[in-house]
Amino acid sequence: MSETFTEISPHQAWELIENEGATLADIRDGHRYAYSHPQDAFHLTNESYGRFLDEVDYEEPVIVMCYHGVSSRNTAQFLVEQGFDRVYSVKGGFDGWERSGLPIETAY
């Protein structure tokens, strides 16, 4: 089991999702998530954490995303400490994801 998470680019995150079925956890606030988020992202909050644990296997890769790639590091480390084996944080966060032209779902 890893003792820490790995920082990856938005494109590396997309490759993990496409090739290995990684779960992308968006930790931004509910309003921002509702407005736009990465395609098929799980909205991870304190309230949804139990459902997250029910739906995600500890052996599967988990990618954490925030606004700019800063606060996702703390959540990624928390998930490592909870026993998740492969945890990643997206450098640049949702801003980087969007700038990279990767798929998003929007309310507009």
UniProtKB/Swiss-Prot annotation:
Disulfide bonds: none annotated. It is found in: Cytoplasm. Keywords: Cytoplasm, Transferase. It holds the Pfam family Rhodanese. Residues 18-106 form the Rhodanese domain. The active site is at C66. GO terms for cellular component: cytoplasm. It catalyses: thiosulfate + hydrogen cyanide = thiocyanate + sulfite + 2 H(+); thiosulfate + [thioredoxin]-dithiol = [thioredoxin]-disulfide + hydrogen sulfide + sulfite + 2 H(+). Coiled coil: none annotated. One of its GO terms (molecular function) is thiosulfate-cyanide sulfurtransferase activity. Its EC number is 2.8.1.1. The keyword Protein biosynthesis does not apply. InterPro entries: GlpE_sulfurtransferase, Rhodanese-like_dom, Rhodanese-like_dom_sf, Thiosulf_sulfurTrfase. GO terms for biological process: glycerol metabolic process. HAMAP family: Thiosulf_sulfurtr. Transferase that catalyzes the transfer of sulfur from thiosulfate to thiophilic acceptors such as cyanide or dithiols. May function in a CysM-independent thiosulfate assimilation pathway by catalyzing the conversion of thiosulfate to sulfite, which can then be used for L-cysteine biosynthesis. Belongs to the GlpE family. This is Thiosulfate sulfurtransferase GlpE.
